[in-house]
């Protein structure tokens, strides 16, 4: 019986902590959600432009090296 309790205790503690976390969490309000969405969109755009310019720079360099 002691082994069963010893085996089940980590799962029980994890479930208890998870339930406490979910109860404590709150949904973001509209203003906070918009701020997060805008920050994410700006980050995606910046990363896209960086990738585009890196590709734009490396295409001519690659053509010079390969000689096509």
Curated annotation (Swiss-Prot):
Transmembrane residues, as ranges?
A: 33-61
Which GO terms are recorded in the biological process aspect for this UniProt protein? negative regulation of autophagy; post-translational protein targeting to membrane, translocation; SRP-dependent cotranslational protein targeting to membrane, translocation
In its UniProt entry, what is this protein called? Protein transport protein Sec61 gamma-2 subunit
Top-level taxon of the source organism: Eukaryota
How is this protein situated with respect to the membrane? Single-pass membrane protein
> GO CC terms for this protein?
Sec61 translocon complex; Ssh1 translocon complex
**InterPro entries in alphabetical order:** Prot_translocase_SecE_dom_sf, Translocase_Sec61-g, Translocase_SecE/Sec61-g
Question: Gene3D superfamilies from the entry?
Answer: Preprotein translocase SecE subunit
SUBUNIT field: Heterotrimeric complex composed of SEC61-alpha, SEC61-beta and SEC61-gamma.
**What is stated as this protein's family in its record?**
Belongs to the SecE/SEC61-gamma family.
Recorded name of the encoding gene: Sec61gamma
Q: Residue ranges, Cytoplasmic compartment?
A: 1-32
What role does it play? Necessary for protein translocation in the endoplasmic reticulum.
- PANTHER family, alphabetized: SEC61 GAMMA SUBUNIT
**Extracellular side of the membrane: what ranges?**
62-68
GO terms assigned for molecular function: protein transmembrane transporter activity
One Pfam annotation reads: SecE
Report whether Transmembrane shows up as a keyword of the record.
Answer: yes
Where in the cell is the protein located? Answer: Endoplasmic reticulum membrane
């Amino acid at each position: 019986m002691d082994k069963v309790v010893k085996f089940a205790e980590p799962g029980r503690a994890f479930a208890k902590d998870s339930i406490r976390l979910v109860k404590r969490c709150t949904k973001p309000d509209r203003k906070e959600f918009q701020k997060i969405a805008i920050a994410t969109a700006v980050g995606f755009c910046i990363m896209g432009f960086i990738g585009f310019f890196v590709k734009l720079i490396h295409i001519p360099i690659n053509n010079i090296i390969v000689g096509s």
